[in-house]
A protein has these predicted regions:
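Solvent-exposed coil/turn segments that connect beta secondary-structure elements
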Residues: 114-116, 164, 235
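Conserved hydrophobic/aromatic beta-strand scaffold that supports enzyme active sites
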Residues: 125, 158-160, 229-231
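N-terminal amphipathic, basic helical "cap/leader" segment at the start of enzyme domains
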Residues: 1-155
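A glycine-rich helix N-cap at a beta->alpha junction
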Residues: 218-235
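Beta-rich nucleic-acid/ligand-interaction surfaces
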Residues: 96-102, 209-216
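Small-aliphatic-rich amphipathic alpha-helix that forms the alpha element of a beta-alpha
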Residues: 79, 109, 157-168, 172-213
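Short, surface-exposed helix-loop/turn micro-motifs enriched in polar/charged residues
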Residues: 101, 202-205, 222
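Short, mixed-charge aromatic SLiMs
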Residues: 130-132, 214-221
Length: 235
């Protein structure tokens, strides 16, 4: 019963609490740092044929078995744009392809690449402001299996979403964490719909090892940690 409290609204309590924003604290950085010289530009996806929204929603299912072969890079490019793509940069905040409470966008996207055209195998981070990738390190299949509690399947790429809670906490204090949970649902659903529209399959993973998932991506587990994952492969 205690866990159910997380699902309930606490907005009335905010009137008694001053957020860091209200205290005049500077906002956290909107993006993580990176070396611009190491950004891998992603393929253009503007001519990629897709199904209609109606057809896509009718066909949407969770896939756990995938065909062999590599995913074309333009399809991966499309999925990244559909899930965290930057539509407009307003300076203090950004508008993206997914909604986020107060446009706070507290997530980072990491990829465990096993079979994508034009990309070597390994772990990457998505750079939305450049629509590109940064290579982080070589893959580790043993640690991946531990991180996903042996739900490795045979997908070509695995999306990992991390959360930087303070991006949301800075404005919304105690209600931030429910907002974060709602927001990540928007992100993953966009992945399902976008993938289905280009003949790819998705299996979202909510059951994972927190310690090993954070270790796999090199996250500290406090200021940034994994909140969700999803397999993507050829359907």
């Amino acid at each position: 019963m205690e866990g159910r409290k997380f699902l309930k609204s606490q907005w009335e309590k905010l009137s008694d609490i001053k957020s860091d924003q209200q205290k005049g604290v500077n906002p956290p950085e909107r993006f993580l740092g990176y070396d611009e010289n190491n950004v891998i530009c992603l393929s253009d996806f503007s001519t990629l044929p897709t199904r209609t929204v109606l057809e896509t929603i009718k066909k949407r299912t969770t896939k756990r078995k995938f065909k062999e072969g590599k995913i074309p890079q333009d399809k991966l490019s499309y999925l990244l744009w559909a899930t965290q793509g930057l539509r407009e940069d307003k300076g203090k905040y950004t508008f993206r392809t997914v909604p986020s409470a107060g446009a706070r966008h507290s997530f980072e996207t990491y990829l465990y690449v096993k079979g994508v055209e034009g990309l070597k195998e390994g772990i990457y981070r998505y750079i939305p402001e450049k629509h590109g990738l940064i290579f982080l390190k070589e893959k580790d299949d043993v640690l991946l299996s531990k991180a996903l509690l042996n739900q490795t399947f045979n997908s070509q790429v695995i999306f990992f979403w991390s959360c930087i809670p303070y991006r949301m906490e800075w404005r919304y204090s105690i209600v931030s964490h429910k907002m974060i949970a709602i927001d990540i649902g928007h992100v993953c659903q966009n992945l399902y719909i976008a993938a289905e529209s280009v003949d790819l399959g998705v299996c979202a993973i909510g059951a994972y090892s927190q310690e090993n998932a954070d270790k796999l991506l090199g996250l500290d587990g406090n200021d940034e940690f994994v909140v969700y994952a999803a397999h993507v492969g050829k359907a």
